[in-house]
């Protein structure tokens, strides 16, 4: 009896292991097309949100509002940009690593760029939140300085495409509908 049970348990383990391998695939990594579609699906709404927030920020800089109103609105806007960047970063992270040469480096590059953008928006929000609104000239000078710093940090966080030398991914980004 023991031999029969041990044999059955061994067979069950082999069958279970086979099912796990079949269901997860060899590496479990998405194809370049699937990864590109997921990444573009994450970045398209993020870009739209950032564009909208940028326009709103520009309006706040020229609107006839009190410093307190401008501060409240800018803190909210930059907080929204920070959250949108984190949401996009999380979705790119959930996309996994594309099944291509340098897939890990490429995925890490996208995530790292979004992390830096998220952090830049967070720092701008925190800087503006700490500004006093009692003196309008000083407040708006502080806002301008915070936005200049944000722009520099944002530019510095741009993805280094020199590491993205995967022809499969380039083709996938050109072809999948989510990236158009």
State where each predicted segment sits.
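Short, charged, amphipathic alpha-helical segments
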Residues: 33, 37-38, 68-79, 104-111, ...
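A charged, solvent-exposed segment within the mature domains of Sec-exported extracytoplasmic proteins
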Residues: 123-180
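Immediate post-signal-peptide N-terminus of mature secreted/exported proteins
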Residues: 28-79, 175-179
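Bacterial N-terminal signal peptides that target proteins for export
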Residues: 2-16
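C-terminal motif of bacterial Sec signal peptides marking the signal peptidase cleavage site
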Residues: 22-25
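Short, solvent-exposed, charged loop/turn and helix-capping segments
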Residues: 86-111, 123-135
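A structural signal for well-ordered alpha-helices, especially hydrophobic packing surfaces
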Residues: 47-50, 54, 85, 89-92, ...
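Heptad-repeat coiled-coil alpha-helices
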Residues: 59-62, 66, 94, 101, ...
């Amino acid at each position: 009896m023991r031999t029969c049970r041990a044999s059955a348990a061994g067979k069950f383990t082999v069958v279970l292991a086979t099912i796990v391998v079949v269901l997860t695939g060899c590496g479990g990594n998405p194809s370049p097309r699937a990864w590109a579609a997921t990444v573009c699906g994450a970045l398209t709404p993020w870009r739209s949100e950032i564009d909208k927030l940028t326009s709103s920020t520009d309006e706040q800089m020229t609107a006839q509002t009190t410093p307190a109103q401008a501060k409240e609105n800018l803190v909210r806007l930059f907080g929204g940009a920070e959250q949108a960047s984190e949401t996009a970063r999380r979705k790119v992270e959930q996309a996994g690593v594309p099944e291509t040469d340098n897939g890990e480096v490429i995925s890490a590059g996208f995530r790292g760029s979004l992390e830096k953008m998220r952090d830049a928006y967070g720092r701008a929000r925190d800087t503006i939140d700490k500004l006093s609104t009692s003196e309008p000239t000083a407040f708006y000078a502080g806002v301008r300085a915070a936005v200049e710093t944000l722009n520099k940090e944002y530019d510095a966080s741009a993805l280094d495409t020199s590491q993205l030398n995967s022809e499969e991914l380039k083709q996938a980004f050109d072809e999948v509908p989510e990236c158009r």
